[in-house]
Swiss-Prot record:
Keyword Transferase annotated: no
Top-level taxonomy: Bacteria, Pseudomonadati, Pseudomonadota, Gammaproteobacteria, Pseudomonadales
Superkingdom field: Bacteria
Domain annotation J: ranges: 5-77
Gene3D superfamilies: DnaJ domain (1.10.287.110), HscB, C-terminal domain (1.20.1280.20)
Organism this protein belongs to: Pseudomonas putida (strain ATCC 47054 / DSM 6125 / CFBP 8728 / NCIMB 11950 / KT2440)
Quaternary assembly: Interacts with HscA and stimulates its ATPase activity.
Keywords tagged on the record: Chaperone
PROSITE patterns: DNAJ_2
Xref: PANTHER family: IRON-SULFUR CLUSTER CO-CHAPERONE PROTEIN HSCB (PTHR14021:SF15)
Name of protein: Co-chaperone protein HscB homolog
Gene Ontology terms: cellular component: iron-sulfur cluster transfer complex
GO molecular function: ATPase activator activity; protein-folding chaperone binding
Length: 173
């Protein structure tokens, strides 16, 4: 049994631009249908299949709702598999990374919750710009190398956003 395309599970065409609210609604509908508890009285085989379907659905949803994971997945299903551990070779972006990290470290040292909020807004704007850039080059034939570079940047910003949320939680306690 092959793994169905994540998009096909949700009756969607592969695209970077998604309506995340509709995706979440469809996920909840499908999750109710395949939830393992619904198969408590079924045969062991049917229970296992329900569990596998539920796990596949959860994985597909987590992938599609995350812009960097969705970008990586699109590249993979288009035959442009991206190794997990390749670094970004863009000096300007590397410098920007260092500046963001230093700024975040200063905000942590100063326990500046308001500053973290401002940083978070700037980071979100940078993520939105990257997402739009990726969507634009994804729609343009022959731009897969650029799409890969943008996806790597998206992954970095996503990781940085997670660190910002964690810092925000620590400072908010």
């Amino acid at each position: 049994m092959g793994t169905p395309c994540h998009y096909a599970l949700f009756d969607l065409q592969p695209s970077f631009r998604l309506d995340l609210d509709k995706l979440a609604t469809r996920y909840r509908e499908l999750a109710r249908e395949v939830h393992p508890d619904r198969f408590a009285d079924a045969s062991e085989r049917e229970q296992r299949i329900a569990l596998e379907k539920s796990a596949a659905l959860n994985d597909a949803y987590q992938t599609l709702r995350s812009a960097p994971r969705r970008a990586r997945y699109l590249l993979a299903i288009s035959g442009h598999e991206v190794p997990q551990e390749v670094t970004v070779h863009d000096p300007d972006f590397l410098l920007q990374q260092m500046q963001w990290r230093e700024e975040l470290e200063e905000l942590q040292d100063e326990a500046d919750l308001d500053g973290v909020g401002v940083f978070k807004k700037r980071l979100k704007a940078a993520q939105d710009t990257l997402n739009e850039d990726f969507a634009g080059c994804w729609d343009a034939p022959g731009e897969r190398d650029k799409a890969e570079r943008l996806m790597r940047r998206m992954q970095f910003l996503d990781k940085l956003a997670q660190e910002v949320r964690q810092l925000e939680e620590r400072l908010d306690d």
